[in-house]
Amino acid sequence: MVNTSFETLPRHMQMEILSRVPLKFLMKFMCVSKKWASIIRGEEFREDYLFQSMKRPRVLFVIDHREYLPIKPEAFFHSVYQEDQPLLLSGKQRMRTFETPLVQVFQPIRGLICQQGYGKIVICNPGLKKFRSLPQIKVHKGAPMRTFFGYDEDKDVFKVLCITWLRNGKRSEVSKEYLVYTMGSDEESSSWRLITCEHDHAPVTEGLFKGGVLYYGAKSNNGKSVVMSFNVNSEDFSVIELEVEISPYWRLVNYKGDIALMNNIEDSLYHSREFEMWVRNEVTGNWDRTSIKISHWNGTVDGKTFYFKGTIGTKELAFAPDYWFGEQHFVSYYDTETKNLRRFDIEGMVDQDDFVRTFFDHVDSTWLI
């Protein structure tokens, strides 16, 4: 029998083996061998590793933890494989990315998340416990700021869209700026670029990134509810008309391949719960309204307040609480075709009372390694 070392294996076999290694061990491997480090940092390996990770997507919990006296805001990241039963924690990543509490966290894209604090934005890879701070945006004190996160597949770069606006004493809008930041795989510093938008609007909902386009609910300058789309590659805005008035309680999701709006207001009726969803037909451009009634709701969630958080894949609706009170944690999935409501208990979560943001279909990535 011939002894074969890792170093003597063909490069494609080395990549195949490394693509199955957990992120925390990849970091150690990079310190052992310059050759391994070169492979792990490569673009080809990054795509292979992402592909393997997509086979077992995770639920990501971003916990806005605050300690008082003195105030020490921190972000805790927990992740679990979203189809295992029970959901077993793969560990906790702890990062202090801000001196102030989190304001906004965008959906994970290719293993990265974009976080906004007061006047500060960072892009981080929770699996690696690494982050990159973006240049400070100069805004007047108290001026609102909304951030959205996307990926340009053609140029292999991430982009952050930031919208700031000022108001006068009567709360009417005075001015608005649209800024874009581009982040590639290298560590070269970039800067915010001012772009133009011909459709004056104010963001209302959180965003959805799908197929190279950012979508978010907004109010036009005449107060009408619309969905704005932003092509991450061309950096062009367009308006999608709506037939319903929206508020921050509405959430945009990818539902069976189409973009959909779902009302996230708590509205339980006895033991059931009913949601209103508007699904856009990509061919006709029309919005179709559907009502989703979930039976046995209260019995599954133990009477707790759960909110719609997104979809698993593209068809199962996922629900989780906004706040945990040091008790048994779990998430719920609802299949709109089979009408099956599933509960997944989360084992190993530390008991604590914190505000929690829950994201689904998160994957591990070697970006920022």
Swiss-Prot record:
Organism annotation: Arabidopsis thaliana (Mouse-ear cress)
Record-annotated F-box domain positions: 3-54
InterPro entries recorded: F-box-assoc_dom_typ3 (IPR013187), F-box-assoc_interact_dom (IPR017451), F-box-like_dom_sf (IPR036047), F-box_dom (IPR001810)
Pfam families (alphabetical): F-box, FBA_3
Protein name as it appears in the record: Putative F-box protein At1g70960
